[in-house]
Amino acid sequence: MFPSSAENSGKCCSQPLFGSFASSESFETSGSDRYGAYESIGLGTLITEDSDSVFDNSNGGYSDTCSSTWAADMLGLDRPFAMSSQRSRSPFSDSGRESQHSTSNLSDSSSLHSPSHSRPAPIGSRGRDMHPYGQRNYRGRGAVVHEAKGQSVGCSCENPSIWIERYCSASPTLVFRGTKRKMMEPVPPCTLVKKKRIVRAAPSKSNIVGPHILEDSCLSSDAKEINGEHELGKKVRAREKRRRRREKNHEKYGDKHRLAFTCAFCKFHTFEDKDIEKHFGSTYHRETLDYIRRQAKFDDKVISFLHDCMVNKFHKTVSNLHKLKFSCGRSKDEWAKIMEGVTEDDYMRRMEVVYCVACDVHIPVLFSSVQQHLHSLTHLKSKVAYKEQLKRDSVVTAKAIINNDNVKERYEKYMKGEDPFATDAKDTSSDSQDANRSDEAEEDEEENSDS
């Protein structure tokens, strides 16, 4: 029933035998009489014979005892549980097992036909149902036997059980400790394999519940609220700028600063109509218009239209002054209100002053004081810097005026040869209000450019 050692040595092993482990073989042989595989389980022979027949038919040449032993271990159903109570207690079982696997005596029933589960698990074993040291072709647990080139030791290089699991079975292959998982099925070499694309199912609308249903509407409403707050804040800032500008003009020119004669390009301000007429014919005013034409790249018709706008504004202001019978001087009641609470002990006197816009300084109406400030180094430097600043501001003001909607309509009439300022009294009053508003907007833009 059992093959002899001579037959096994002729089939499986062709290398010289290791005879230095005779003592350990004797101990293992004595223990195999009590713990043999065929004595403990009756199905051992049947399984071994079936496995031998499978290997003979499928991979002809794997009918040796070593192959049948490993197949019996792999195809055994409940043998680990049946043999768990019959494990060897011999302290020399491991050493004897090593010697048997290293020698050619493969006929010993205790080492070849008994499964690895019936032996004490050595260090490095993964426990029950897992065979240790798979990387050594299942030849033992001792030192690795170095093979010479062209020679084979023991069984074939590939174990039949692995061949069965890889080619004849649909179950996944064994994974040992330290090996990497195979994420894709093995493919033949020189074959382009496209990586499988992971498609994630998008959540359906029916599954969306709660506040997410109106997500788009909420976002749109939030955007509208943000835009509304932005527009409101913009209007508030513009209103504050106009208020500060009015206060500044009130400090400079008094309560009637809106009824003064002004030139928006040259920033000329006066309460005398003769002074403003003189300014419109001055060289300084013409130089300012030429500077605007060069910097803004306007045509001559645009420059002449802007000049006519300033002249028309002057005529409107004159007509309004005649209607209101306005005088630039202050009345006695106004002076009394201003000087209220002032006594002789305070040593305060009312007098006229000269205001220097370039230096932002008030000078007493005295010849010596005015001449001293006129020839001072501070005034000379401030005068040059202020003139350059006025030129830059004039370009910004001209662009703001020409881009106004009302001014655009007038400019179209002006280009057609019509009189753009020939309107009735109602339109004139509304235009004057619009002009004042546009002037305030222009002043706001000038403040932004200064900052």
Swiss-Prot record:
One term of GO molecular function: zinc ion binding
Subunit-structure text: Component of the DBIRD complex.
Protein name (Swiss-Prot/TrEMBL): DBIRD complex subunit ZNF326
Biased composition (Acidic residues): 440-451
Source taxonomy: Eukaryota, Metazoa, Chordata, Craniata, Vertebrata
Recorded superkingdom: Eukaryota
Organism expressing this protein natively: Danio rerio
Biased composition (Basic and acidic residues): 413-439
Residue interval(s) of motif Bipartite nuclear localization signal: 180-200
Location of this chain's protein in the cell: Nucleus
